[in-house]
Design a protein with these regions (language model features):
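Nucleotide-sugar donor-binding/catalytic module of glycosyltransferases
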Residues: 1-118
Length: 118
């Protein structure tokens, strides 16, 4: 399983196109874990709309606000267990074959150098 990790903070203007781009991926075996850092705009409302449409999108909550993006990603890494991890920012836009191309390249490297190669 592929875990996509996203940290958000006041990303209302950007997050919808990013979520749509993730939903359009050619590989479907993924779960998106989102940790919001205390947004005061409509970011959580936009995320909730997508959660209702797709069970692969999860909002992971904790009681600490303003961890910052780097600490939010580290927090998610400690909470999520997966075969592969991908990181995305709220203002990214992924081409439809991003996951497919990434996994394909990683598989090639693992075959060449062994599975313990990061």
């Amino acid at each position: 399983m592929i875990a996509i990790l996203m940290a958000t903070y006041n990303g209302e203007k950007y997050i919808e196109p990013q979520l749509k781009s993730i939903l359009c991926q050619t590989i479907r075996d993924w779960v998106l874990y989102i940790r919001d850092d205390g947004s005061t705009d409509r970011t959580l409302s936009v995320i909730s709309k997508f959660i209702k449409k797709d069970i692969r999108i999860k909002l992971v909550s904790d009681t600490v606000e303003h961890r910052g993006a780097d600490n939010s990603f580290m927090w998610l890494l400690n909470k999520v267990n997966a075969d592969y991890y991908m990181f995305c920012d709220q203002d990214d836009y992924w081409l439809p074959n991003k996951i497919e191309n990434t996994i394909s390249r990683m598989d090639s490297i693992e075959k060449e150098r062994g599975e313990s190669t990061p």
